From Swiss-Prot:
Protein name, as recorded: Putative manganese efflux pump MntP
Membrane topology of the entry: Multi-pass membrane protein
Domain of life the protein comes from: Bacteria
Organism: Geobacillus kaustophilus (strain HTA426)
GO MF: manganese ion transmembrane transporter activity
Amino acid sequence: MGAFIGEIIALSMMALALGMDAFSVALGMGLLRLRLRQMFYIGLTIGLFHILMPLAGMAVGRLLSREFGSVATYAGGALLLWLGGQMIIASFRRDDGSPLFPRGVGLLFFAFSVSLDSFSVGLSLGIFGARTMVTILLFGLFSMVLTWVGLFVGRHFQQWLGSYSEALGGSILLAFGLKLLFL
């Protein structure tokens, strides 16, 4: 039971880290003054993609783990290190490009692009044999809720909080990568 609770805590922290990426992007999208119905669909779509992408990643990760064993374990840890580092670096860059309007194909493209990193984390978790259902439900729930929160507070705090939330998420993934490689 203690191991299960520990796994839920670790997976929740990873879900928080991945959700912070969606949160930081949603902060900027909150400036578009979207309707509540649009915000609901945006959060729901991002949550769904944060279920599907790590699910696909976990399937590939389990296959790699069976085929390559301990080499895949180190690759999974290195992947988390790389992804965390990329998130931290991205948090310090300024991207003034025009945002996609979050409707129709634009929303699907947006949700896909925000959830790409959850595929990579799912790949690592698949290598380590994490519980699939718990993982995808936590990832989907955290990203959906954090997207909604980001959309709501985006008008007020985007300039201050945006890069810090992505840096925090990257730091969490970086820490897990170090843990997997060295502990």
